[in-house]
Amino acid sequence: KVVNMHPAPYKQEASFTFDEDLFNNCEDNVNLYGYFQSEKWFSHIENSIRKDFEWRDDVDAMCSQMFENITGGQAISLHIRRTDHLIKPTYHPVLPLSYYEEALSKFPSDIPVIVLSDDPAWCHEQELFQDDRFLISDSGDNITDMCLMSMCQYQIMANSTYSWWGAWLSNSEHVIAPKLWFGPDGQDPKDIYVKRWKYLDV
């Protein structure tokens, strides 16, 4: 067994708050550990980041065809995060359906809604999603779901990193996110919020 006795140095973010000192003084050729979930980290290289996150050709082709078939070219992405949030609700609370109902009221009512979730079985049971305009993804694949999310012109986010990136990659001007990101055991989310998005109370 070969052991690297001189691993590359690394920097780890202390919290979800943007660290200006780390941003200005981080040396080259280090590994970064953390979420770095704020536009403040990369707004100056936004185009490069978007290019780095472009979908593989096969994924893009499959999702584009799927998106066109189920939506006709326009859709609202509605993301629900449940599984791990149910375990630690004081850190990441599960958002109530009332949040999604209010968010839906802000968008046109004749646009199809793609419901994306880590708990699609639960979504199928909810009366809110029984109308024909709601299409619940049962893909079971995180890449497919995020690709579909990024193609939607309207976004209704959960308090989730996965949701954040899906909405950000869509580059949509019509994004609704919850003001409530963390519970009482969580951190200050101020730098997670993207200024151009709209935020609703929960």
What are the functions of these language-model segments?
Residues V194-V202:
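Conserved histidine-centered catalytic loops in small-molecule metabolism enzymes
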Residues K1-S109:
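Secretory-pathway luminal glycosyltransferase catalytic domains
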Residues L104-I192:
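Donor-binding and catalytic core of enzymes assembling or modifying cell-surface/extracellular glycoconjugates
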